[in-house]
Amino acid sequence: MNQTIISAATEGTNPLVPNPWEMGVVLAGFAVLFYIVVKFVVPMFEKTFAERAEAIEGGIAKAEKAQAEASAALEEYKQQLTDARAEANRIREEARAEGAQILADLKEKAAAESARITAHAHAQIESERQAAVVSLRAEVGTLATTLASRIVGESLSDDARAARVVDRFLADLENQNAGAAK
């Protein structure tokens, strides 16, 4: 026994060259481990990586879609705001034009009413003046006849003669007023 130990110790095996049995066992273990990794672990990693890539790409696509929708909504909002401002300006201008038209109509109606009232007042004044002239002619005629009969000393009871005297007197009076007015 000592002899085997000594012969083993003296036997010249190279420590750098592995034992072929050890090498076979290690290679078989590596092959089994490699098969398990390739068959089960790598597909799980690939599946996880694919899901992550899909989630990231889907998130990017969703973000781009949301950005596009937000941009479209912003453009629609701006367009609606522009349309609303244009509509407000149009309504404001229509209101101004309508107000100006109403004001012009009211001024026209006021001018027509003023002209009507003025014409009515002139007509009323003229009718009152005519009534006053008729009344005054009658009174002046009576007074003139009475005064003339006192001055002349004779009675002017004849109506035709009295009417001529009154008419002549009034004509003289109108001539004096017309001359004084000029």
From Swiss-Prot:
State where the protein is found. Answer: Cell membrane
Q: How does it sit in the membrane?
A: Single-pass membrane protein
Does the record's keyword annotation contain Transport?
Answer: yes
Q: What is its main location?
A: membrane
* Record's protein name: ATP synthase subunit b
The protein's organism comes out as: Arthrobacter sp. (strain FB24)
Q: Where are the transmembrane segments?
A: 25-45
This molecule's function is given as: F(1)F(0) ATP synthase produces ATP from ADP in the presence of a proton or sodium gradient. F-type ATPases consist of two structural domains, F(1) containing the extramembraneous catalytic core and F(0) containing the membrane proton channel, linked together by a central stalk and a peripheral stalk. During catalysis, ATP synthesis in the catalytic domain of F(1) is coupled via a rotary mechanism of the central stalk subunits to proton translocation. Component of the F(0) channel, it forms part of the peripheral stalk, linking F(1) to F(0).
Q: Which residues form a coiled coil?
A: none
Any one GO molecular function term: proton-transporting ATPase activity, rotational mechanism
Q: How does it assemble?
A: F-type ATPases have 2 components, F(1) - the catalytic core - and F(0) - the membrane proton channel. F(1) has five subunits: alpha(3), beta(3), gamma(1), delta(1), epsilon(1). F(0) has three main subunits: a(1), b(2) and c(10-14). The alpha and beta chains form an alternating ring which encloses part of the gamma chain. F(1) is attached to F(0) by a central stalk formed by the gamma and epsilon chains, while a peripheral stalk is formed by the delta and b chains.
Q: Which family does it belong to?
A: Belongs to the ATPase B chain family.
Among its keywords, does the record have Ion transport?
yes
Short name of one Pfam family: ATP-synt_B
Q: Which GO terms describe its cellular component?
A: plasma membrane; proton-transporting ATP synthase complex
Any idea which UniProt keywords this protein has? Answer: ATP synthesis, Cell membrane, CF(0), Hydrogen ion transport, Ion transport, Membrane, Transmembrane, Transmembrane helix, Transport
